[in-house]
Structure formats: C-alpha cells, structure tokens
Swiss-Prot record:
Keywords annotated in UniProt: Cell membrane, Cell projection, Cytoplasm, Disulfide bond, Glycoprotein, GPI-anchor, Lipoprotein, Membrane, Secreted, Signal, Synapse, Synaptosome
Lipid linkage positions (GPI-anchor amidated asparagine): N147
GO molecular function ontology, one term from the record: acetylcholine receptor regulator activity
Oligomer and partners: Interacts with nicotinic acetylcholine receptors (nAChRs) including CHRNA3, CHRNA4, CHRNA5, CHRNA6, CHRNA7, CHRNB2 and CHRNB4. Interacts (via NxI motif) with LRP6.
Main location: secreted
Listed name of the protein: Ly6/PLAUR domain-containing protein 6
Function summary: Acts as a modulator of nicotinic acetylcholine receptors (nAChRs) function in the brain. Inhibits nicotine-induced Ca(2+) influx through nAChRs. In vitro, specifically inhibits alpha-3:beta-4 and alpha-7 nAChR currents in an allosteric manner. Acts as a positive regulator of Wnt/beta-catenin signaling.
Species of origin: Mus musculus (Mouse)
Transmembrane as UniProt keyword: no
Residue span(s) of domain UPAR/Ly6: 47-141
Subcellular location: Secreted; Cytoplasm; Cell membrane; Synapse, Synaptosome
Any one cellular-component term (Gene Ontology): perikaryon
Glycosylation sites: N134, N147
Biological process according to GO: hippocampal interneuron differentiation; nervous system development; neuron differentiation; pyramidal neuron differentiation; regulation of synaptic plasticity; visual perception
C-alpha cells in the first residue's frame, strides 16, 4: 500500500489545530473590551474602569472586575501594581478616581521590603487594561486637558480688533 499525501496533510492539519488551541492567552484583548462596553451610559460622559482590590495579578483583576459604571465624581482609571524585583506581581489594585489621586504616578522602590510599586492613571472607557511595570508605563495619560479654563479673555478682544481692521473699520 502506497502512502497517501491527503492523509498526511489531514494528520498534519489536525496536529497544528490542537497546538493552536493549547496556546490561548490569559489576557484580555481590545476585542474583548469592545464586547464588554455597551453603547449606552447612565449619564453623559459615563465610563468604566477595571476595578479590584489587591488581586494576585492582572488576569485575576480583569477577569473578576465588576461590570459597573464609575461614579460621577470620578474621571480617571487608576492602577497600582506592586511587584517583586523579578517583575512577578504581588498585588494589583484598580479603581475609578478623581484627578487628585492621579497627580503622583510613577514607580518607587521599597528598599526595606524589596519590591517596587508602579502607579498609572488613564482617561477613557476601560483604559486600565495593562499594568505599569516601569517608568515608561507608569504615566498619567489623558485625552482632554487637565486644566480646562475658558481661554484667555484678551484673545477675544484681539480677534475682534483684527476683524475690525480687516474689514476697514475703526474702533
């Protein structure tokens, strides 16, 4: 009996398919987040953050985070990651916070305990998916200006004056 190429291909494809099933990731993807976030909000500008208190790692935090909207008096998603010197997670805390809790992001070493704590904040729906692991990740990322003033009052008078001159009028 001679070997069948079709049978060999079938066996090879079956083996590859089994390997692909075994290589699934434990982390969430952007596609998962879009599925989690519905299009309606309880109030204008409503948003969600992953929330957990001292979870063992990022997967445990994101997996069991309650699917609720942040309170109106909050604006950002906060993440605090405590890790060993090797980078292994000790604890993960995520929550909705006001601006004041996001003013000291970054990483610091705990010399006596031998671990590092990195803190980050972000603005947006479920934006706190990843963990901060170093100074590059431990940032305060916003999509809108933090200091929302009404602009400079003298700018309006300058613009009006320029329009008057351009139109050939005098003040």
């Amino acid at each position: 009996m001679e070997p069948s190429p079709a049978l060999a291909w079938l066996l090879l494809l079956s083996l590859v398919a089994d390997c692909l099933k075994a290589a699934q990731s434990r982390d969430f993807t952007v596609k998962d987040i879009i599925y989690l976030h519905p299009s309606t909000t309880p109030y204008p500008g409503g948003f969600k953050c992953f929330t957990c208190e001292k979870a063992a790692d990022n997967y445990e935090c994101n997996r069991w985070a309650p699917d609720i909207y942040c309170p109106r008096d909050t604006r950002y998603c906060y993440t605090q990651h405590t890790m060993e010197v090797t980078g292994n997670s000790i604890s993960v805390t995520k929550r909705c916070v006001p601006l004041e809790e996001c003013l000291s992001t970054g990483c610091r070493d705990s010399e006596h305990e031998g671990y590092k704590i990195c803190t980050s904040c972000c603005e947006g729906n479920i934006c706190n998916l990843p963990l901060p692991r170093n100074e590059t990740d431990a940032t305060f990322a916003t999509t809108s200006p933090i200091n929302q003033t009404n602009g400079h009052p003298h700018c309006v008078s300058v613009i009006v004056s320029c329009l008057w001159v351009w139109l050939g009028l005098t003040l």
